[in-house]
Structures are given as C-alpha cells and as structure tokens.
C-alpha cells in the first residue's frame, strides 16, 4: 500500500474515533442540573482524562454525581449511585457524592467545648450532630449548599465554600476548598483545604456511594472489601463511638484479608443481627483505625465487584475510614438508571478523623480535629480505579 493510502486510512480511522467520542451518549443532561437554589446558580461539570473516563460534578454540595470507568471488557460503567437531576438532590435528603462539612460523622449530643466555651450544634441524628447538622429543609451542612466554582479545567475542578462564624453553631469564619482531579491513571485525587479566623473543628470527607456492579439494582453485598485496619471504634445503639479502640480479629469487622460484604449482613436488619456492633449499626456503619497511620502512599481500602472486575483502592492521609453499607437507603427517589435506591445498593468509604474526635481527642490513639487561625487544614484522598 502506498504511503498516501496509509495516511488516508489513518486519517479516516482518527475521524471515526473522534466522531464516536462526540456521539457518546451522556450519562447526565447538563440542563437537568441548572437551577437556582438559595439564590445561587447550580450547574454540572465534566472532568475527562486520556482514557475517556469521566467524573461528573455539581456545585450543589460539591458533589460527585457520576464516575465512568472501564470494566474488564472495556465497557464504561458508572461506579456510583445518585440522582439524575438537581431537583431530586435539592428536595430529597441525601449525601450522595457530597463534600461533607464542617464536621463529617457524629459529634456527641451536638456539643463541642473549645477554650472553655461550649458550642451547641444541631442534634439531627439520635440527639447527636451528624455531618455538620445536615438538613435539606433549612438547609444546613455543606452538602446542602451551593459552592462557588473557583477554577475548572479539562480534568480538574476547585470549588470553594465561605462559611460564616456561627453557621450551624460552629465557631469561626471558615474558607474551605475541595479540588477534584481525574488523572490519566484513572484515579480521582481529592484535596480538601480550610482556614479559619477562630479556633474551630474541621473534618471533611466525600460521601460517594459506590456500586461497581454496572447494574445498580444489584446490591453491593457481593463486593469484596479489604480494609487495612486491625482495629475499629465501636459504637453504641445511637451510632455514637464509645471511645474504645477494639481489635477486629475474630469479629465481623475483620476485613484485613478481603471478604464479601454480605457475608455477615445479607438479608438482615435491626434485631436480627446476633453481633452487637452490627445490630447497633444496622449493618456496617463504623470507623476503622487504619494501619496506614496517615500515610497516603499506602492502600487503606479496596472494593471489588466480581461482576465487572472493577475495583477502587483508597489512599488517604487521614487516620480513619468510615465503611457504611447503605443500611438506610429506603428507595426515596430513583437512581440514574431508574432503579429505586434501596438498602445496600451502595456503600461508602469515607476518609476522616474519628467520629466525635472533638470530645475524645485526649483518649489514647485518637486524633485532634482542631483548626486554629494561621493553620491550614489539609486532607487528601485518592480513589484509584482499575480492573482485574
């Protein structure tokens, strides 16, 4: 074949590839995420990489709403559940994909004491403050507010939240940012930063609900979970940590060698659990004490679907990770595939300081969540996707 013919064929193939990419059916409709909420405009942004992977982000709650990655056959699959329009996000109480703050997880009785001053926070969960007092009807919690887009490029977006002193009862004027970057190795790199003008507490995380099965009507109980953690923090019947750090060995909390999530919880709820901790959490809703000891170069967790071959590894500079097995998904609203989001159709791996750290930081093995003026809060999480 002549050189000119080869070039012609190559050019035609390139054009076909471009056309195929342009004609790709979008997971979400941008227009369905454009509205005004609490006086601010919401929108939808798409991050892409060299491998045609995508991460879809809305500035409402600085949320990840879709993650498109290839399965073992090269077919693109959405790795997270969530709604397909902004109306559902702004009317149905949910944390799907959100940036949680000021303080992710629970604070006992919604009370913190800083320099002998008692601050009362919302008591929105069994008398405790959960996820910054999240309430879609007020709204409270950073996941229920519209963030400002500071910068956006092809593979990254930075969003900013200006939180006033006294918001949800928390002290200090806080400026917080989250940056999502989709790397060419199919990793989502998340960086949270914050500063304050008054001593306060900060604990930010991402609340994506993973389902790696491709078909999100299939529960995540078939997923294989590995947690690099020899210990966890037990909770009581109100989901509040007791202050104890307990070994996982010989308990359903042991995921050190990788285990099917449903092994100890499939088909069970509430009083049906024999294990006290599973009964207290209505399944898994606990914080694990990571062996990685805040080293974000070491794998903290791995989640794998045997159906698609997709896995996600988690790396973090935080000391803990909350594994939540979607125990309270009740079917309110349908997901992007039209499925009702019912119990255990998604699970969360939330990197974090330990729950109630503001009241337990003096206990052995616990960490402070205090942020002072002049300091910068920095938290890092990587969700590394792949197949096997």
Task: Describe the function of each predicted region.
Residues 15-17:
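C-terminal motif of bacterial Sec signal peptides marking the signal peptidase cleavage site
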Residues 12-13, 217:
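Alpha-helical transmembrane segments and their juxtamembrane interfaces
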């Amino acid at each position: 074949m002549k050189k000119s013919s080869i070039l012609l064929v190559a050019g035609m193939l390139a054009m076909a590839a471009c056309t195929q990419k342009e004609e790709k059916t979008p997971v979400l409709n941008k227009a369905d995420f454009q509205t005004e909420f609490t006086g601010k405009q919401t929108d939808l942004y798409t991050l892409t990489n060299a491998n045609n992977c995508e991460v879809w982000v809305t500035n409402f709650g600085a949320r990840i709403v879709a993650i498109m990655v290839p399965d073992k056959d090269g077919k693109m699959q959405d790795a997270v559940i969530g709604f397909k329009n902004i109306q559902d996000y702004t009317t149905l109480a949910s944390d799907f994909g959100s940036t949680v703050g000021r303080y992710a997880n629970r604070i006992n009785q919604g009370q913190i004491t800083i320099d002998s001053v008692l601050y009362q926070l919302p008591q929105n969960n069994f008398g405790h403050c959960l996820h910054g007092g999240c309430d879609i009807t007020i709204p409270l919690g950073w996941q229920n507010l519209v963030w400002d887009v500071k910068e956006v490029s092809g593979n990254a977006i930075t969003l900013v939240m200006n939180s006033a002193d006294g918001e949800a009862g928390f002290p200090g004027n806080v400026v917080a940012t989250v940056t999502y970057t989709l790397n060419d190795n199919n990793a989502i790199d998340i960086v949270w930063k914050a500063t304050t003008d008054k001593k306060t507490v900060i604990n930010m995380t991402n609340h994506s609900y993973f389902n790696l099965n491709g078909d999100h009507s299939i529960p995540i109980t078939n997923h294989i979970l590995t947690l690099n953690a020899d210990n966890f923090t037990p909770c009581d019947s109100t989901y509040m940590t007791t202050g104890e750090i307990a070994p996982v060995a010989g308990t359903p909390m042991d995921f050190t060698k990788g285990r099917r999530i449903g092994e100890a919880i499939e088909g069970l709820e509430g009083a049906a659990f024999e294990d006290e901790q599973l009964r207290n959490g209505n399944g898994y809703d606990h914080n694990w004490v990571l062996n990685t000891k805040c080293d974000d170069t070491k794998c903290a967790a791995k989640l794998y679907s045997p159906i698609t071959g997709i896995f996600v590894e988690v790396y973090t500079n935080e000391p803990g990770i909350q594994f939540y097995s979607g125990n309270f998904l009740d079917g309110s609203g349908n997901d992007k595939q039209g499925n009702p989001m019912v119990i255990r159709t998604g699970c969360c791996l939330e990197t974090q300081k330990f729950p109630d750290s503001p009241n337990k930081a003096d206990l052995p093995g616990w960490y402070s969540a205090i942020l002072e003026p002049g300091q910068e809060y920095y938290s890092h999480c990587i969700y590394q996707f792949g197949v096997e």
